[in-house]
Amino acid sequence: MATYMANAKTVSPRWLLVNAEGKTLGRLASRIAAILRGKHKAEFTPHVDAGDFVVVINVDKLKVTGNKTQDKQYHHHSGYPGGLKTINFADLQAKKPQRILELAIKGMLPKGPLGRQLYRKLKIYAGDQHPHQAQQPELIDL
């Protein structure tokens, strides 16, 4: 008997809703990355997008342990000499709270075309409202 390999025709994604209020950043990000990959399903296949859509709400209420609120730095570069920009966790959470979780999850997904496809299935919102009510997402507790 041949080994089962999932493909786009056999996989049916679900919509899941995650409330990030009071959750720790890294633990939440790793669980969401596994769901996006489809590792929670029996038919997981490494080279196939077998994951589910994930809608995350209340990311403005994420927490981190220790002194990371002030010590954790996020860097990006403009490409020009002297163009390194740095912002700490507290300031980024005040300006763009969804960007923190986006960066954490994106780093945990595969690099390349499959990783970009999986990343598009992630929807992150700072408040408790989201525009995906029509998909009837199931609330899960991580």
From Swiss-Prot:
Provide one Gene Ontology cellular component.
cytosolic large ribosomal subunit
Q: Which GO terms describe its molecular function?
A: mRNA binding; structural constituent of ribosome
For this UniProt record, give its keywords in alphabetical order, as a comma-separated list.
Answer: Ribonucleoprotein, Ribosomal protein
Q: Which Pfam families match?
A: Ribosomal_L13 (PF00572)
Q: Does the keyword section mention tRNA processing?
A: no
Annotated PROSITE patterns: RIBOSOMAL_L13
Q: Which GO terms describe its biological process?
A: negative regulation of translation; translation
Please name the InterPro entries in this protein's record: Ribosomal_uL13, Ribosomal_uL13_bac-type, Ribosomal_uL13_CS, Ribosomal_uL13_sf
| Quaternary structure and partners | Part of the 50S ribosomal subunit.
- HAMAP family per record: Ribosomal_uL13
The record's comment on protein family reads: Belongs to the universal ribosomal protein uL13 family.
What job does this protein perform? This protein is one of the early assembly proteins of the 50S ribosomal subunit, although it is not seen to bind rRNA by itself. It is important during the early stages of 50S assembly.
| The protein's name in its UniProt record | Large ribosomal subunit protein uL13
Q: Which organism is it from?
A: Coxiella burnetii (strain RSA 493 / Nine Mile phase I)
- Tell me the classification of the organism that encodes this protein: Bacteria, Pseudomonadati, Pseudomonadota, Gammaproteobacteria, Legionellales
